[in-house]
């Protein structure tokens, strides 16, 4: 089991396009817009009428998880693939749902996104039947998928948040304020719920029939609120822990600085006293004229001035050191708090996994592993912090706007160029520029297309578009940017 999870963890983001999740959105939105156009055609027919529903929705809802499965199965089937076991592939299938059946409003988490494309229908069926995750004709999540997803969420909500703090995307004060505000929102929501329950209770008491069953729903809701208050308590404990760490670490810094300052002053004074003693002994043992005595006084005065300046410089340096040291220790406190949170989140996940294992194994568990644990709110607040402080950061927003132009331009060029490639009349239909674009696409992707057998025209056209998606989604951010600049003469 650890080996399966380790492999799945290393591979789970392999399908992400350049610029991450925003890149996914750009690809899907581009196809939604283009497929609505009547002039987006193939042999004079609108392409939206050639493709079937699943093909269209695959293109309109590009998903990194589905792309990962495609890469690990289809695109390495040339005899040199990585030969993953079905248990690993099934663990990576986070959403065993096709593009015609998913909905973010679904209660069941497995249907929140599409998990595989039309092109992988057969392999997914084979995987699920082999591993036993097809139950009563329906695909369900592999049990280890829940752990993979939880590990991904914990890393995102802790390690990524820690990196963002280290880069200065938010201050400790901003984080604490945000965390407190989110807790207040949760508590206020509970107060509203209690008030609504009391309104209903008053109405029922007014029309009381004398049966306790009349109040069962309200009693049940009160029990849920009491349980949720426990969750809020544990969520608050995270903030208490962070504040305590910062308080202690900063106090230690201040104490250290005071000790250093006092020690320096003592050393300067001792040095000054020793100097005076030495000079006085000279006066007693030697015959000195008036000028010598004046010189000694001048030397003493210089020494006093230097000592005063040294103490002042030391104080100023200490203030700067204190500021830097304080920042370091605040980061250290935040880092320790994140480690503390991480352990609690892992504990919560393991509790839910073991407590719900029977329903997970039977394929009826519908939630993530934070559901109904003491840190259900904590993970949501941490994810919200990432959204607030990282994704809405100006530098990130500029990068995403740039990413939109880059990906859309590449799709415009390569998708339109590929329509008539490898057709009988491709010389007539393709422009010289179209042919050049096709030559840029990696040969291994074109070979994969050429050796595939298709049932009809729709499969051929769909597979060409998927080939371009494979090409673009396989780029790094920098490669996509450089290719865009080269194609558009931006140097």
Regions found by a protein language model. Give the residues of each.
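Short, charged/polar, low-complexity loop and linker segments
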Residues: 130-135, 326, 386-387, 453-460
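Short, hydrophobic/amphipathic alpha-helical patches that form generic packing surfaces
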Residues: 94, 149, 153-160, 335-336, ...
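Substrate-recognition/cap regions that form aromatic- and gly/pro-loop-enriched pockets
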Residues: 355-443
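Charged/polar positions within long, soluble alpha-helices
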Residues: 73, 156-159, 163, 351, ...
């Amino acid at each position: 089991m650890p080996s399966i999870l380790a492999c799945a963890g290393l591979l789970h983001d392999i399908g992400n396009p350049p610029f991450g999740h925003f890149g996914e959105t750009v690809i899907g939105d581009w196809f939604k817009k283009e497929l609505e156009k009547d002039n987006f055609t193939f042999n004079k027919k609108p392409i939206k009428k050639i493709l079937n529903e699943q093909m269209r929705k695959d293109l309109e809802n590009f998903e990194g998880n589905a792309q990962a499965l495609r890469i690990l199965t289809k695109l390495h089937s040339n005899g040199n693939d990585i030969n993953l076991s079905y248990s690993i592939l099934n663990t990576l299938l986070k959403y065993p749902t096709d593009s015609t059946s998913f909905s973010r409003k679904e209660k069941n988490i497995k249907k929140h996104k599409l998990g595989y494309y039309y092109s992988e229908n057969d392999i997914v069926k084979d995987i699920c039947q082999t591993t036993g995750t097809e139950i009563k004709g329906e695909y369900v999540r592999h049990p280890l998928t829940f752990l993979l997803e939880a590990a991904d969420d914990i890393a995102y909500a802790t390690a990524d948040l820690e990196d963002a703090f280290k880069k200065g995307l938010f201050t400790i004060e901003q984080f604490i304020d945000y965390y407190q505000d989110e807790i207040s929102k949760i508590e206020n929501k509970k107060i509203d719920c209690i008030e609504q329950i009391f309104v209903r209770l008053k109405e029922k008491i007014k029309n009381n029939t004398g049966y306790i069953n009349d109040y069962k729903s309200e009693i049940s809701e009160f029990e849920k609120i009491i349980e949720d208050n426990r969750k809020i308590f544990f969520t608050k404990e995270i903030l208490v822990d962070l504040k305590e760490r910062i308080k202690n670490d900063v106090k230690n810094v201040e104490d250290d600085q005071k000790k250093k300052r006092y020690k320096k002053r003592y050393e300067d004074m001792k040095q000054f006293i020793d100097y005076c003693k030495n000079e006085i002994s000279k006066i007693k043992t030697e015959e000195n004229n008036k000028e010598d005595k004046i010189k000694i006084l001048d030397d003493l005065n210089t020494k006093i001035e230097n000592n005063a300046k040294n103490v002042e410089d030391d104080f100023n340096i200490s203030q700067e050191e204190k500021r830097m040291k304080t920042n370091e220790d605040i980061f250290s406190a935040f880092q320790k708090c994140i480690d503390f949170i991480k352990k609690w989140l892992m504990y919560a996940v393991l509790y839910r996994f073991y407590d719900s294992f029977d329903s997970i194994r039977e394929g009826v568990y519908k939630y993530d592993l934070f559901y109904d644990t003491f840190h259900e709110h904590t993970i949501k607040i941490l994810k919200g912090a990432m959204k607030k402080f990282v994704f809405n950061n100006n530098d990130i927003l500029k990068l995403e706007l740039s990413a939109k132009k880059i990906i859309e331009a590449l799709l415009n060029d390569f998708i339109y160029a590929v329509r008539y490639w490898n057709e009988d009349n491709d010389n007539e239909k393709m422009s010289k520029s179209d042919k050049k674009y096709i030559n840029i696409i990696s040969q291994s992707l074109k070979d994969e297309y050429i050796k595939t057998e298709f049932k009809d025209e729709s499969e051929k056209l769909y597979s060409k578009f998927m080939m371009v998606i494979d090409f673009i989604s396989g780029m790094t951010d920098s490669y996509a940017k450089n290719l865009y600049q080269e194609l558009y003469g931006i140097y």
